[in-house]
């Protein structure tokens, strides 16, 4: 990243030099040729809970950028329902009203190559990560921020506490009155979790 950023900085230095000498057209040509504006396309992205869960399971409920274990969203919601003061939830995850575990431990889908940068919006370009990592990565490519993609987890191991979730919902069916828990329970029923 260093050399590329340095060379881009030097392109802008050349542009400023042209400004100083009154050569606005030259400055424009330098930018167009050496560091052109390329707008990021904001393509709509959407996946179903079932598609997301399939990716979470494929990745072993592990963050593919850090390797840290993540927790099934339905399980986080059960904890919040049982301990609302100690583990509060906010539907928009407001950090002053919601336990930070939702940001650190709830899995989400990230596009390895951002859709806005030419990546596909399908499972070949989707990986599991936390909301913290997803927000930090934003529309950057991995090499631009010095990250790498960890391999998929194979075999039985961490299940993101999905086993606990299934046992708890079976033991306490009224949990399904919560829309979020019901949504994730339906997705879990549709796939086999290792």
Task: Briefly describe each language-model feature range.
Residues 54-57, 99-101:
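Short, conserved, surface-exposed binding loops centered on an aromatic residue
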Residues 68-126, 140, 147:
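Histidine-centered nuclease catalytic patch
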Residues 3, 7-10, 152, 156, ...:
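Alpha-helix boundary/N-cap detector
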Residues 63-66, 130-133:
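Short cysteine-rich clusters marking metal-coordination/redox-active sites
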Residues 138-169:
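A contiguous, mid-protein "functional segment" used to position or interact
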Residues 1-54, 60, 67-73, 170, ...:
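A boundary/linker detector
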Residues 53, 59-61, 110, 128:
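Residue-level detector of short, conserved catalytic/binding motifs and their immediate flanks
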Residues 167-194:
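Short flanking/linker segments adjacent to small metal-binding domains or redox-active Cys/His motifs
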């Amino acid at each position: 990243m260093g050399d590329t950023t340095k060379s881009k900085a030097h392109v802008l230095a050349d542009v400023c030099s042209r400004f100083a000498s009154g050569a606005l057209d030259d400055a424009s040509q330098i930018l167009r040729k050496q560091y052109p504006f390329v707008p990021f396309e904001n393509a709509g992205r959407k996946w179903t809970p079932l598609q997301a869960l399939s990716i979470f399971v494929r990745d072993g409920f592990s963050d593919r950028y850090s390797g840290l274990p993540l927790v099934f969203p339905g399980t986080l919601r059960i904890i919040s329902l049982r301990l609302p003061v100690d583990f509060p939830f906010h539907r928009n995850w407001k950090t002053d009203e919601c336990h930070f575990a939702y940001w650190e431990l709830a899995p989400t889908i990230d596009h390895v190559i951002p859709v806005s940068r030419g990546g596909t919006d399908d499972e070949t370009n989707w990986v599991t990560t936390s909301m913290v990592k997803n927000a930090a990565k934003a529309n950057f490519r991995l090499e631009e921020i010095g990250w790498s993609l960890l391999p998929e987890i194979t075999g039985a191991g961490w299940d993101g506490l999905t086993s606990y979730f299934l046992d708890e919902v079976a033991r306490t069916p009224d949990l399904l009155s919560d829309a979020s828990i019901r949504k994730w329970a339906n997705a879990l029923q549709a796939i086999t979790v290792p």
